């Protein structure tokens, strides 16, 4: 009996070790892997499950997560809608937010979104300085004055103000942060590695599906 018990314990220990080594995690836990927002926020995705990524171009952790988010988007389920939201915690984050919305207004966000990240983190260009930003945009083939006009437009100013308010309303403590269905928040800090963050995101989506199925 002692021998059987020994081998049982050994097998369990080995199994746990293999699970840890393979990156398999236990079920997500509130407070450790995600939090519930104090008040649910309205979504803009209709019947789809809304996923928001709050980010800042200058954030190295956002930059690290970005390729994983892009890969996840390619296999995203049809019942899920994804949207980037540039966060604003401080005044020096506003230029990045306005840059994002100006690119959207000009219809070139998809073309230049990654390049903005690379310019900041690989080329070490401080795009929070407007003269450098405008010159850089011109080098990307965007007419300088056209970008300046979009950047300073009333519409972009309004969107930047809305991002500032959303950063407060969603109870953000930092970025990157992912909000699912206006209720569940996970972040790079909570998620661990970028891969862990994506796994938590996927499990939160499954959680929302199950909750909706019960209604």
Please provide the spans of the model-predicted regions.
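Extracytoplasmic thiol/disulfide redox context detector
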Residues: 2-94, 164, 206-215
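Structural microenvironment flanking redox-active thiols in thiol-disulfide oxidoreductases
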Residues: 75-106, 110-138
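Extracytoplasmic/secreted envelope proteins and their assembly/folding machinery
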Residues: 66-73, 96-100, 113, 130, ...
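Periplasmic c-type cytochrome electron-transfer domains
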Residues: 27-37, 125, 130, 196, ...
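Alpha-helix N-cap/helix-start motif
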Residues: 62, 92-93, 126, 190, ...
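C-terminal cap of thioredoxin/glutaredoxin-like
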Residues: 3-5, 139-215
């Amino acid at each position: 009996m002692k021998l059987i018990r020994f081998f049982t314990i050994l097998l369990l220990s080995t199994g746990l070790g293999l699970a840890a080594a393979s990156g398999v995690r236990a079920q997500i836990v509130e407070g450790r892997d995600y939090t519930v927002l104090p008040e649910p926020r309205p979504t803009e995705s209709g019947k789809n499950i809304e996923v928001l990524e709050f980010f800042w171009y200058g954030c190295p952790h956002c930059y690290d997560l970005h390729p994983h988010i892009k890969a996840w988007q390619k296999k995203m389920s049809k019942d899920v809608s994804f949207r980037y939201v540039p966060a604003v915690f401080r005044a020096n984050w506003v230029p990045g937010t306005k840059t994002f919305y100006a690119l959207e207004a000009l219809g070139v966000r998809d073309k230049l979104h990654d390049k903005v990240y690379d310019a900041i983190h690989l080329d070490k260009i401080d795009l929070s300085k407007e003269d450098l930003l405008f010159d850089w945009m011109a080098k990307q083939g965007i007419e300088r004055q056209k970008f300046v006009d979009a950047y300073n437009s009333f519409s972009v100013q309004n969107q930047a103000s809305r991002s500032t308010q959303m950063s407060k309303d969603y109870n953000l403590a930092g970025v990157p942060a992912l909000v699912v269905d206006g209720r569940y928040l996970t972040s790079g800090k909570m998620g661990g590695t970028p891969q862990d963050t994506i796994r938590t995101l996927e499990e939160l989506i499954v959680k929302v599906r199950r909750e909706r199925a019960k209604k």
